[in-house]
Amino acid sequence: MLHYEDRIDLYDERGKLLEENVPLEAISPLKNPTIEKIVNDIKRSVAINLAGIENALKTGAVGGKACFCPGRELDLPIVENAEIIAEKIKRMVQIEEDDDTVVKLINGGKQLLLQLPSKRLRVAADYTVSALIGGGATVQAIVDAFDVDMFDAPVVKTAVMGRYPQTVDFHGANIATLLGPPVLLEGLGYGLRNIMANHIVAVTRKKTLNAVALASILEQTAMFETGDALGAFERLHLLGLAFQGLNANNLTYELVKENGKDGTVGTVVASVVERALEDGVIRPLKTMPSGFTVYEPVDWALWNAYAASGLVAAVIVNVGAARAAQGVASTVLYYNDILEYETGLPSVDFGRAEGTAVGFSFFSHSIYGGGGPGTFHGNHVVTRHSKGFAIPCAAAAMCLDAGTQMFSVERTSALVGTVYSAIDHLREPLKYVAEGAVEVKEKEKVI
């Protein structure tokens, strides 16, 4: 059952048509099978750093920074026996022989991807089951494989799971999940927003439009969870996901191509307005005595989607020219500011993206200046305020950064990137979401 008449064409990151005449709802998290799979796999997956565990035990440096326990070292050939450990983990975690449990060794056994059977999530209250089961199974597998006694077993636990439960998170652990502990969420329903931009960039291997897509999918899917993408506002968020996140109608790609060589934030604004007029998304309302034209939207939600596509294009053009991510906050701020002055229309997310950028600028490189753009996420107290339209810009910026950041992708997200990028639909969401949309299109018998 389709509620909206909108149709879109889906393109990949190179401007190649993937599928045309797609119903807007075919990219909805409630209908698209790939997006459902992305969310489910994020919840049930945990990255386990076997090489990190081995090194921590060998040196006695367990439990995070500055924690060193002389005399508690254990020299265990964990990576060498990775296949044995993986098999033991699988036996503990798997429920049925034919269930969807995945245990995959990566990088010569240095890392391991564990995906819990979906049934374990269905009988759990929240998604931390993946970290707790994954960590617990790894501890038991190592203890069993190397016959570790009761006095050294706690050291193994700390090498695997860090200081938890002395801390509410897994501080100093050698396991990692994309979703942080629920106790750290800024509000109800913010779980999918609690993934820093650097993680998204690492998972998509710095492919800009795929990083934008994954960030947008997570942010906009969260809007369905929080009750924002509901009723009168559902179409607004679906169009935002389509145009800003999934390069619908190739708009983002074309805006970047048009302005990439010698364009600025201002020329991107001009291109967006021109395209919106051509496509009948906005129209002139009146001309002032000064000659200034005030516009009105023909379609409010579609105007927001065009503006959001232009926003990420402006970030790509501006940050891409500098090859420095630090400018993303001011680009988000002044793109929206210029757009409002140029048209008399509301900017992206009806001002929330612009307002978010003010705080984003302050906390990323103003007087405070404590965090680089890549460390921010939709659950952050600074960047939570936009309803899904700001974090895709931060992800785009970090893809284009040429190593200027203290909090680089390599520093914050190496394990996450190595392990989670092995999941195809997380690494290349544009391609696989389009395939999912085709399934919906065929099911709904759309020609």
Swiss-Prot record:
Cofactor names: coenzyme F430
Cofactor descriptive note: Binds 2 coenzyme F430 non-covalently per MCR complex. Coenzyme F430 is a yellow nickel porphinoid. Methyl-coenzyme-M reductase is activated when the enzyme-bound coenzyme F430 is reduced to the Ni(I) oxidation state.
Residues involved in coenzyme B binding: G370
GO molecular function per UniProt: coenzyme-B sulfoethylthiotransferase activity
EC class name: transferase
Catalytic reactions of this protein: coenzyme B + methyl-coenzyme M = methane + coenzyme M-coenzyme B heterodisulfide
Transmembrane segments: none
Binding of coenzyme M, residues: Y368
Keywords: Methanogenesis, Transferase
GO process terms (BP): methanogenesis
Role noted for this protein: Component of the methyl-coenzyme M reductase (MCR) I that catalyzes the reductive cleavage of methyl-coenzyme M (CoM-S-CH3 or 2-(methylthio)ethanesulfonate) using coenzyme B (CoB or 7-mercaptoheptanoylthreonine phosphate) as reductant which results in the production of methane and the mixed heterodisulfide of CoB and CoM (CoM-S-S-CoB). This is the final step in methanogenesis.
Assembly, per entry: MCR is a hexamer of two alpha, two beta, and two gamma chains, forming a dimer of heterotrimers.
Similarity comment: Belongs to the methyl-coenzyme M reductase beta subunit family.
Protein name: Methyl-coenzyme M reductase II subunit beta
Organism: Methanocaldococcus jannaschii (strain ATCC 43067 / DSM 2661 / JAL-1 / JCM 10045 / NBRC 100440) (Methanococcus jannaschii)
Lineage: Archaea, Methanobacteriati, Methanobacteriota, Methanomada group, Methanococci
